[in-house]
């Protein structure tokens, strides 16, 4: 509450609060403490519910945009309504707590109960952020970290169980190339499109890909916008979320982007790098050589 914030600022001007700082807070008796406790529990519950909607939560179950509707747009509309309702209720609760404690401590002339939107504990829906998190969840399904058939984490080490992935099979060799063209059938873009089709249906695939591409803010055909996001921005966004402990590892040939691939750290095997070299790097080099020869033949024929 505002009261606690003001008192803690006096007791400890830094941003760190110790148990001894909390112990120093003056506590005045209030006749209806259960009312305050219920409000506080309600606030905590809503905050946790919002936090659990993101994959960094230990209690994450599934992405909020995966539901019974057939378009990502409708799923986002439902999610936005849920977020707006939760935001409004939590803001009202926090303002009520402020009002009660301001009255208890007799601080009506110093503080007001109103809470600015930016200070409310939970967040509102954000189209680009939430679509990017949907893409991140899809990548998790590609690697088997998540499954469309299992709540929460499907695999984070231990014994691999292929039976957890009947609806959308996880990548077999834990190597997914990120390509600027359709060099491999199971590249990141191709697998993502298949994932969207599996989740939302083939009838709405084009509509969903366009909605996702528009949310990413790119220009051009939806497939190419999504491909460019995987090429240029996905891994940077992943590292922002997981900071210095990314769960997907990027193998990159250098600045020219000749070859890139992701693996899932928990599925790393002693032969992963060797397999990547023989099954993917050599294959892509061969495709590049073929493309170069084709261009040289065209130039020769035109001269």
Task: Label each residue range with its predicted role.
Residues 1-24, 31-46:
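Basic, amphipathic alpha-helical recognition segments used for DNA target recognition
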Residues 16-21, 55-67, 118-122, 156-160:
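A glycine-rich phosphate-binding loop feature that marks nucleotide/adenosyl-phosphate handling sites
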Residues 22, 26, 37-44, 48, ...:
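Short, well-ordered alpha-helical packing segments
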Residues 28, 49, 53-93, 99:
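Acidic/histidine-rich catalytic neighborhood
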Residues 18-34, 78-88, 124, 193:
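Glycine- and acidic
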Residues 89, 99-102, 106, 110-303:
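Terminal accessory regions of large proteins
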Residues 21, 26-31, 62-64, 109-111, ...:
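Short, flexible loop/turn elements at secondary-structure junctions
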Residues 7-19, 68-76, 115-117:
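Active-site-adjacent bridging/hinge elements
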């Amino acid at each position: 509450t505002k009261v606690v914030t003001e008192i803690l600022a006096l007791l400890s001007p830094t941003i760190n609060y110790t148990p001894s700082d909390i112990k120093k807070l003056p506590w005045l008796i209030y006749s209806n403490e259960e009312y305050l406790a219920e409000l506080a529990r309600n606030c905590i519950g809503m905050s946790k519910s919002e936090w659990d909607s993101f994959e960094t939560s230990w209690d994450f179950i599934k992405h909020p945009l995966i539901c019974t509707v057939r378009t990502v747009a409708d799923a986002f509309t439902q999610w936005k309504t849920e977020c707006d309702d939760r935001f409004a209720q939590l803001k009202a609760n926090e303002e009520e707590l402020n009002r009660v404690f301001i009255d208890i401590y007799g601080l009506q002339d110093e503080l007001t109960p109103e809470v600015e939107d930016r200070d409310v504990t939970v967040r509102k829906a954000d189209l680009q952020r939430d679509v990017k998190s949907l893409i991140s969840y899809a990548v998790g399904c590609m690697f088997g970290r998540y499954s469309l058939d299992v709540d929460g984490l499907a695999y984070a080490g231990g014994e691999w169980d292929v039976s957890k992935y009947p609806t959308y099979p996880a990548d077999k060799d834990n190597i997914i190339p990120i390509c600027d063209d359709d060099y491999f059938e199971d590249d990141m873009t191709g697998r993502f499109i298949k994932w969207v089709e599996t989740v939302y249906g083939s009838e709405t695939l084009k509509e969903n890909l366009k909605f996702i591409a528009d949310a990413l803010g790119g220009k051009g055909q939806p497939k190419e916008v999504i491909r460019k996001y995987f090429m240029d921005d996905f891994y940077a966004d992943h590292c922002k979320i997981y900071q210095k402990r990314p769960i997907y590892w990027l193998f990159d040939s250098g600045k020219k982007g000749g070859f890139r691939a992701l693996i899932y750290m928990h599925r790393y095997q002693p032969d992963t790098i060797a397999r990547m070299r023989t099954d993917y790097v050599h294959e892509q080099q061969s495709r590049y050589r073929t493309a170069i020869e084709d261009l040289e033949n065209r130039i020769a024929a035109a001269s």
